[in-house]
A protein has these predicted regions:
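Catalytic cores of nucleotide-sugar-dependent glycosyltransferases that transfer UDP/GDP/TDP-activated
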Residues: 1-345
Length: 345
C-alpha cells in the first residue's frame, strides 16, 4: 500500500513538534511503516520522519514567518497542492491531514476517488455547509463528536478513527505530585482556569505550551507565577513526558469543543489521571472513575481533583494502551485505506 500524506506546514512533522497534529502524524507514519505501508510525506523540510520526505518549504512556516522569510501561508499551501497533483498517480491513497485547503483534490478525475480527508479540528458551520455541497468525499474524523455533525450535514462516507499515540514512548510513573497543564496559552484552552484551581486547592501547578494570547498571559497567568505556579514554555517530547508523568493530575479545562484532545491520552500514557470539562470529544476519551473525571461546568472542576488522585495509575496506562496506541490506530487506517482501494476497483 503506497500512501501520500499531506502534512501541515505550520510546524515540522516530528515527535517533538509544537503542534499536536504534527506530533500525531509523525507517530502514525511510523506505525503504518511497521504495517508495511510505503509512506511519502509532503511537509516542511525540517520534518523528521521515516517516510520519503518531499519538502514543500525548507523550514516550517512559523519559523519562516518569525524570521520574516514568509508572510502569506496560502502560497506555500498552493505549492503543496501542486506537488500533490504531480505525484498523486503514484499512490493507492492520498491522505490529507489538512482542512480546509485541498478538498478540491477529490474533484480531480482519476485520483479524486482515492483521496481521504482527515478532520482534526472542530467542525464549524462553514464546513457543514461545504459537506452539504460535496457529500461524497471520503472523510474520517478523530471523534464521533465530529462525525455526528458531518453525517447530519449529509456526509455519506464519514468514518471515525480516534487519535492515538506511541504509548511506549511515554514513561509510566506509579505516582506523581501536583498538577500539570499542557496546551496553548489562550482562553479556549483554559490555562487561567487551571491557575485558579491550583490556587483554590493549594496545590503546585506547572504550565507548558506556546503563549498565543499574550494579554491573557500577562493578566491572568504571569501575576501568579512563583514557587507554587510555574510556566516552563514550549516542551519537546522528553520534557512533555517528564511533565505529565511527574504530575498527580492533568488539568484540561478546555472551554472550546475539542475535536479530540491529544494531551489527554498523553497524560494517561504516563498513568496520570485527567480532570477536564466535558466538551467536544473528551467524553469519548476520558472514562469517568477509571482514567479521570469530567465536569459539566468550570466551577465543578476543583472538586474532582482529589477523587482523581485516588484512581489506579496502572489501570489508566492499560486503558490508553488498549484504546489509543498508534499500533491500534494505524490498523484502523489500513482497513480504511483498503476499503477505499476496494471501492476503486
Amino acid at each position: 500500500m503506497k500512501v501520500l500524506h499531506l502534512g501541515p506546514l505550520w510546524f515540522p512533522v516530528s515527535r517533538d513538534a509544537a503542534g499536536g497534529r504534527e506530533t500525531w502524524l509523525a507517530g502514525l507514519i511510523v506505525a503504518l511503516d511497521k504495517l508495511g505501508c510505503r509512506n511519502t510525506l509532503l511537509a516542511s523540510g525540517d520534518s523528521q520522519t521515516p517516510a520519503e520526505l518531499v519538502p514543500v518549504v525548507p523550514r516550517n512556516l512559523v519559523a519562516l514567518m518569525t524570521d520574516k522569510l514568509a508572510g502569506e501561508a496560502l502560497y506555500y499551501q498552493e505549492h503543496q497542492l501542486t506537488l500533490a497533483l504531480a505525484r498523486a498517480a503514484e499512490f493507492d491513497v492520498i491522505h490529507s491531514h489538512l482542512s480546509p485547503g485541498v478538498f478540491s483534490l477529490s474533484a480531480v478525475p482519476s485520483i479524486g476517488a482515492r483521496v481521504l480527508h482527515t478532520q482534526h479540528t472542530p467542525v464549524w458551520q462553514d464546513f457543514e455547509w461545504f459537506i452539504r455541497q460535496h457529500p461524497d468525499l471520503w472523510l474520517n474524523t478523530v471523534s464521533e463528536f465530529q462525525a455526528r455533525k458531518l453525517r447530519a450535514a449529509g456526509a455519506r462516507r464519514c468514518f471515525v478513527v480516534h487519535n492515538g499515540i506511541d504509548v511506549a514512548s511515554f514513561t509510566f510513573q506509579p505516582q506523581g505530585a501536583g498538577l500539570a497543564f499542557l496546551g496553548r496559552i489562550e482562553a479556549g484552552k483554559g490555562p487561567d482556569i487551571a491557575v485558579a484551581i491550583a490556587r483554590q486547592l493549594g496545590l503546585p501547578l506547572t504550565l507548558a505550551g506556546p503563549v498565543i494570547d499574550r494579554e491573557l498571559f500577562a493578566q491572568k497567568i504571569e501575576p501568579h507565577l512563583g514557587e507554587q505556579i510555574r510556566y516552563i514554555g514550549v516542551v519537546n517530547h522528553a520534557q512533555k513526558n517528564e511533565l505529565l508523568g511527574a504530575a498527580a493530575c492533568a488539568l484540561l479545562p478546555f472551554r472550546g469543543a475539542e475535536g479530540f484532545g491529544l494531551v489527554s491520552i498523553e497524560a494517561m500514557a504516563c498513568g496520570t489521571p485527567v480532570v477536564a470539562l466535558a466538551n467536544g470529544a473528551l467524553p469519548e476519551v476520558v472514562e469517568p472513575g477509571v482514567t479521570g473525571y469530567l465536569a459539566a461546568r468550570e466551577e465543578e472542576l476543583a472538586a474532582l481533583v482529589l477523587p482523581a488522585l485516588k484512581l489506579e495509575r496502572a489501570q489508566i496506562r492499560q486503558r490508553v494502551a488498549a484504546r489509543f496506541d498508534l499500533s491500534v490506530v494505524a490498523g484502523h487506517y489500513l482497513k480504511l485505506y483498503e476499503q477505499i482501494g476496494v471501492a476503486n476497483r
